[in-house]
UniProtKB/Swiss-Prot annotation:
Topology versus the membrane: Multi-pass membrane protein
Cellular compartment(s): Cell inner membrane
Gene name in the database record: fluC1
UniProt KW keywords: Cell inner membrane, Cell membrane, Ion channel, Ion transport, Membrane, Transmembrane, Transmembrane helix, Transport
Function summary: Fluoride-specific ion channel. Important for reducing fluoride concentration in the cell, thus reducing its toxicity.
Cellular component GO terms held in the UniProt record: plasma membrane
Name of the featured protein: Fluoride-specific ion channel FluC 1
Cited InterPro entries: FluC
Length: 109
């Protein structure tokens, strides 16, 4: 792994982490991340840029641990119905948003 690649990867991850703290709402972060993921996955991008974008940026921005922590709060508070509804809504909605991003990107190119 060369230094330029590593530096770019770390900088991208840092920027995503910074943006993560700017948006406090996990739902909004999830929707934005899914749309952008779908948008960029259909683009013709080099393998190294995809690795940087998907593993560096999206992994830090959408942070699965933040999502799980949010769901865990429902469990602690005993809101099992909210947990079930939120989990299903967020998964289905994110798949739809990702698909929209993918289709939009294909129409642009």
């Amino acid at each position: 792994m060369n230094k330029k690649y590593l530096l770019t990867f770390l900088l991208t991850a840092y920027c995503a982490t910074f943006l993560r703290f700017y948006f406090k709402n996990n739902f909004v972060i999830s929707i934005i991340g899914s749309f952008l993921y779908g948008f960029f996955i259909s683009r013709k991008i080099s393998k190294s840029k995809k690795e940087i974008l998907f593993s560096g940026f999206f992994a830090c921005f959408t942070s699965f641990s933040g999502f799980v922590h949010f769901l865990y709060q429902f469990i602690i508070q005993g809101y099992y119905l909210k947990l079930f509804i939120y989990l299903n809504v967020i998964v289905i909605l994110n798949l739809i948003i990702m698909y929209i991003g993918f289709q939009l990107s294909r129409k642009i190119t």
